[in-house]
Amino acid sequence: MSVDKSKALVLWLDEVTIEDIPIAGGKNASLGEMIRNLSPLGVKIPYGYVVTANAYYYFLDYNNLRDKIRKILEGLNTDDLKDLQRRGHEVRELIRGGTFPPDLEEAIKDYYNKLSEKYKTHAVDVAVRSSATAEDLPDASFAGQQETYLNVVGAENVLVAIKNCFASLFTDRAIVYRERFGFDHFKVGIAVGVQKMVRSDMGASGVMFTLDTETGFKDVVVINAAYGLGELLVRGEVTPDEYIVFKPTLMKGYSAIIEKKLGRKDRKMIYGTGDERVKIVNVPKEDQKKFALNDDEILQLAKWGVLIEEHYSKKNGRWTPMDIEWAKDGILNELFVVQARPETVHSRKKENVVKIYKIKTPEEERKNRVIVKGIAVGDKIATGKARVLFDLKEADQFQEGEILVTDITDPDWEPVMKKAAAIVTNRGGRTSHAAIVARELGIPAVVGTGNATEKIKTGEEITVSCAEGETGYVYEGKIDYEVEEINLENIPKPKTKIMMNIGNPESAFRYASLPNDGVGLAREEFIIANYIKIHPLALLHYEDLKELYEKLERENLIDEKGFVQFKLIYHYANGRLANKLAKGKDKLRVNLRKILQDIENLTFGYEDKATYYIKKLSYGIAKIAAAFYPNPVIVRFSDFKSNEYANLIGGILFEPEEENPMLGWRGASRYYSDVFKEAFGMECKAIIRVRNKMGLTNTKVMIPFCRTPEEGEKVLQVMEEYGLRKGENGLEVYVMAELPSNIVLADRYAQIFDGFSIGSNDLTQLTLGLDRDSELVAHLYDERNEAVKRLIAQLIKTAKEYGRKVGICGQAPSDFPEFAQFLVEQGIDSISLNPDSVLKTMLAVVEMEKKLGVLK
C-alpha cells in the first residue's frame, strides 16, 4: 500500500528519500536514501522512523501554540541578552508543556513497539535526533540547534525526547537568527528521527570525509575515531585517531591505509544508569595507546565512504564529497553508518584558482616566536589582536577582526566566530566544532593547543599560521607573509616534465593541486627526523640496549639521572651490540635511561621496534606517493650525514665523529656496510609495503652519493636480499648524479641504473672543491659556473645515448629561471623544483621551448 507522504505524521526510514527533506528533514531524508540504495550493497545502517514536520505543526495547532509563541516574542530586542533568555525559556517551556494529539501519540508508540519487535526486545534503545526542514534558509545550520538524545528507552521517554526536539527549534541562538534575517518562525519546521542506537558506548564512533578536509584533495577518505558515543568527538573534547585511506588503490583491492595517527582518547561517553542517560568516564591507560579501529575496520569504512560518495555524486550529476558519521557496536562487533551529508566547503570551491600563502620571516626567527602550536585547520595565515574569552557572557567585548582564543567552542559561539580573523582553542581536533566552522568561514584556526588561554594575553598582537602543514603555529607579533593567487587555466604546459621536491608529507596534498608531472625528489630525512625520531640501529638493538642497561644498573654504574660513561657501554655490551657501536667516544657520558624511555614511549602499541620504523616510514612515503598518483614519485633513500644521524634518539651510540661528514659515511656507502646494512633493509621493507601492500607502484627509488659503479651494484644486491628487486613489478632505480665521478663514468652507471637525477648542490661543491657553509669561500659557490654547466651538459648527452632518463632535483632551477632554460636547451627530461617556484620556472621553460621550436 503506497503512503501519501505529504500528509504523513510518521514514516519508516525506508519510506523516505533525499527528495523528502521538506517533511523528513535533511538527516532523516539522507538515512532513508541510503537504506533504500546502499543497504543492498552491504552498507549497514540502523533502522528507525521519522516523526515528520507535519506532526510538528499538528502538535503546535492542537495546543494553540502559534499565537502564544508570537505573543511572547513580540517586540523582542535581540541585543538585550537577559530579555532574550527569558522569552526563549518561556517559549521552550510552553512547547514542553504541550500534549500530543491522541492519534499522533498512538502512532509514535506503535512505531516504537514495532521497532522493538524488529530488534527482538520489548523496549529498544534509540537515538532521538531533530532535523530542521526549512528549505529556503540560506544557512540551515542556524535554523535550529540540532538536538540529539541518546539511549532513550521506552515509548514514554521517546515522547518526552521528541517534545524536547520540537522545543530546540526555539533556542536563543535560533530565535536571534530568524529575527535578524526576518524569517517567519513558523516557516521553519522540524522533523525528528527515532533510530536504533548502535552500542558504540562499548565500541567506538567517529566521522569520515571522502576528501581531505584541509586541502580538498579528492582521492582520500579521512576517518576519525574515538571510544564511546560520538558526542565528545563532535564537541572536540577528545582528540581522535586519524586514518587516511587512498581511494584509487583501495578500489583495486589493496590495503590502502596511507596514514595512521594515534589520538588522545582519554575520556569517553557511555550509557548511564537510572535517570542519567549518558555519562563520561576515563579511558584505561592501555586503551588510550591503542588505535580505536583495526585495519580491516578502517578499510571497510573507507569502502562504504566511497560507495556513499558515488551514489550521491551520480544522483547530483557532479562530484559530491560526503561528511559521514559512523559507529561501531561493541556488543555485535559490527560497524554502522548513522548519518551522511554532503561536505559543503570544498565542493563549492573554484578549482582553477590556487591561493598560496608564503611566509617570508626566516624560520630561525619564527622558532623563537612560537607561543603555542596545535592542529592546523585550512592553509591560511591571519594577524590580529588576541581576545581571550573564557565564557560566552564576555562575547560583547569581542571586536570585528580580532583573533578568538578560547578553551572550546559549540554552536552558541558562532555569532562571535563570524567576526573573528582566526580562532585558537585549547581543545578539539580536526572535526571539532571550531574546525568545522573555521573551514566554512574560510579563516585559519589552530585547535587542540592545550594551553592557548594561559599563554596568550588579550590585546597582544599575534599571527595564526596554518600554512606550514598539519601543525598550526601561533606566533608573537606580526609574521611577514605574502599571498599569491594563481589562475591555473592561464598556465601553459611545457614538454619538459615539471616535477616537485617534497620533504614534508603533510604538505603533499596541498602541493599536488599545482600543475606537475610528479615528484622528482621525495626525501626520507624529514620523515625519519619528524615521524620516527629514533636512530634505526637503536630500534634494531633495543633489546640489547635494555639488557646492557640492566647489567650496568646491577653493577651500580649508572648515576641517579641515568648517565653512564661510554667506555663502560663498550665494556659491558654483548657481541651483537658491540660490533655496531661508534668507536673513539670513551670519555663521552650518555643518558642511557632517557634513550630507552624515549624509545619505549614513541613505539608503544607497535608489535616490535623494527615494525615501528617500517610502518612510520611507509606512511610518510605513501602520503607523498598518493598525493601525486599515478605520476612517478622518486624516493631518495636516507642521505643523513653522521652528525645528522647522531641527533636522532640513540644516534650518539652508533654514529662516528667525523671531521668532514659531508664527504664521509653517507649515502650508498652505508647501505652495504656490515654496521648499517640491516637499517637500510628496513627502508627497503618500507618501500615494498608502499608498492605491494598499498598499491602505490608509482613509487620509484634513488641511491644518493654513490661514489663508484661498483658501489651501485653492491647496493642493488643488498636491496635484493631484502626483497626489493629492480624491474620487479615495474620498479625503477635511479642514481643521484652529484659527484664528478657519476658524470665521468656515466656510461657505466647507465648500465646499472634506470636513470639519473642531478643533485646540483653537492655537484657544485665537489666540482669547485668548496664547502658552501664556510663563509670564507661561500661567495665562490654558484651552480651557474661554467665547469658545473659543462658537466651537466655532458651527463644529459650520455644519458640520452644510453636511453636513460635524466632529470634534476637540485636547488639551481628553483633559484634561477635562466638555469632552467639552460637545462631545456640541453634536452633534459624533467626538472624537479621547490613547490614555491613551480609556476615561475614553468613559464621560463615554456618561453625557452617556444624559442627552440619544441613548443608551438
Swiss-Prot record:
**Cofactor requirements of the protein:** Mg(2+)
Name the source organism: Aquifex aeolicus (strain VF5)
EC number(s) per entry = 2.7.9.2
Q: Where does Mg(2+) bind?
A: 738, 762
Q: Which SUPFAM superfamilies match?
A: Glutathione synthetase ATP-binding domain-like, Phosphoenolpyruvate/pyruvate domain, Phosphohistidine domain
**Is Transferase one of the keywords?**
yes
Organism superkingdom: Bacteria
Q: Name one GO molecular function term.
A: metal ion binding
Give UniProt keywords alphabetically: ATP-binding, Kinase, Magnesium, Metal-binding, Nucleotide-binding, Transferase
Instruction: Point out the gene that encodes the protein.
Output: ppsA
Q: What name has this protein been given in UniProt?
A: Phosphoenolpyruvate synthase
Q: What else is known?
A: The reaction takes place in three steps, mediated by a phosphocarrier histidine residue located on the surface of the central domain. The two first partial reactions are catalyzed at an active site located on the N-terminal domain, and the third partial reaction is catalyzed at an active site located on the C-terminal domain. For catalytic turnover, the central domain swivels from the concave surface of the N-terminal domain to that of the C-terminal domain.
* GO BP annotations listed: gluconeogenesis
Q: Which family does it belong to?
A: Belongs to the PEP-utilizing enzyme family.
**The protein's annotated pathway:** Carbohydrate biosynthesis; gluconeogenesis
